Amino acid sequence: MFKNYCCVVLFAFTGFYCGAQNINPDLLANRWDAHWIQVPNTPARDYGIYLFRKTVNLAAKPAKMIVHVSGDNRYKLFINGTLVSLGPARNDLYYWNYETLDIAGFLTSGKNTIAAIVWNDGDVRPEGQISNRTGFLLQADDKSNDILNTSDSWKCTQENSYAPIMGIGYSAYYVAGPGEYRDMHKSLQNWMGNDYDDSKWQNASNIGWSGATPKGIGDISGWMMVPSTLPQMELKPQRFATVRQSEGILLPTSFPAVKTALTIPAHTQVSFLLDQGFLTNAYPELSFSKGNNATIALTYAEALFEEKPDGPGKEFRKGNRNEVEGKIISGRRDS
């Protein structure tokens, strides 16, 4: 058996986004000391998930610590295990965005870990995602903090627990990228935390001989760097509103509006249909334990189909989106 918690969760990155006015002028006019980095001996443009870590010791908690961060395709940045940035905002290679943020509030005196996960969807990336190749970049705003700059001093590894899930269950023009399959047996746990042992990880390798280059200075690295003009997207917790259908399980009346433990016996298959009641953009978060070799599958859809949209002659009718009885869900999936 395993326990499972399900909700839609967004986290607010408020209070530390800095914007272009906090960028050292030297970084707008000169080549950076930080290099784009990669995991050695991994494909440059194929699908892949990569982890990067840097451990530093600080004599005291800083009052300010501004950094500029980017990745290709995208990254999540963690400070001492806390997610602090998600980016970069999409653009093209002639205007490749970097995010500017003050990470001082997440640092402490003594040991600190800066960590990032970077993913490249390769040939199955969304149509709107321009890409040069897989890479990660972090540049300290002040030269006194250049120990943070990405270089071959960073540790790295490939995360092999991920794979893309193609398609949305029926034939249609779909170019929004793949779903995500995760094998938790292969997953690296707590890799972004201070206590994680990365002694067996490789040192990163620099991409090319030059540091990153701001737009107008050169395009040696392949990305012409510009400061993002958009603040980080607002992210805040948002739970699902109601359960519309369920099979194989009697759900507590408090679920899903209130965080509730669900115990699912071994060798049992259950399903339930969650309805938010309004359009939302969100990242689902699941908390679960036990259930070795169990499978969890999530399917997302704006509305249900009146019949399974899987063959010739099907009209893909949806009807009233508030009606669910006798209908079929088909859409993008994670598992």
Predicted regions mapped to residue ranges:
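Bacterial Sec-dependent N-terminal signal peptides
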Residues: 1-25
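Extracellular/oxidizing-compartment recognition motifs
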Residues: 22-335
